[in-house]
Amino acid sequence: PIVSWINNLEFKKAAEKLEFLVVEDIYSDTETARYCDLLLPSANGLKKEGVLINTERRLSKLNPVLEKKENELTDYDIMLGIGKALGMGKLLDKWKTPRDAFETLKACTKGMPCDITGVNYDMLKDSRGVQWPFRAGEELKEDERRLFEDNKYYTPSGKAKFIYEDVAPVPYEQSEEYPYLFNTGRGTVGQW
């Protein structure tokens, strides 16, 4: 969204140049929504079900606490509908519920660094989350695990590889009138 983008003026300029902008949001009056050609109204998070994966690698279960109204759609419903509208129906046959989608995701991770084949949908319901990798057959012994504690990295050499980018200059100068710079937490690579 524009409000939290690293440089929202650049975002606005880019949005104005787009041929077509789709925004999915629970509000229709956001600054970003004002630029869109198509607004997909979404149910708020209190009505959603599914599994979230954060940047700490933690899978958490999102349980709805409010009922959806008739014709109200969640993110999942919207993305599933778009997929079907694009002719992907056969590929999405197994995706009837968020649980089904999770099972499909889980199968895709087998043997990968992010393997979650040991995570079961029900184990996430009342937990504080499970960090990947968590392979089938592993036992969850602790609440938090650190990735690469064993010094084994997913690189050809097995060693850590650091990738960095040059720090961009601050787009605004501090002044007496505006002595503080605001950091949204977003960077050019991701958000942490």
Residue positions per predicted region:
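Generic alpha-helical secondary structure signal
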Residues: 9, 13, 77, 96-99
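Non-catalytic, well-ordered alpha-helical segments in soluble enzyme domains
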Residues: 76-93
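Short amphipathic alpha-helical surface patches that mediate protein-protein
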Residues: 87, 99-106
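A cross-kingdom feature strongest in bacterial/archaeal respiratory oxidoreductases
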Residues: 1-70, 103-192
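Short coil/turn segments at secondary-structure boundaries
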Residues: 93-98, 117-120
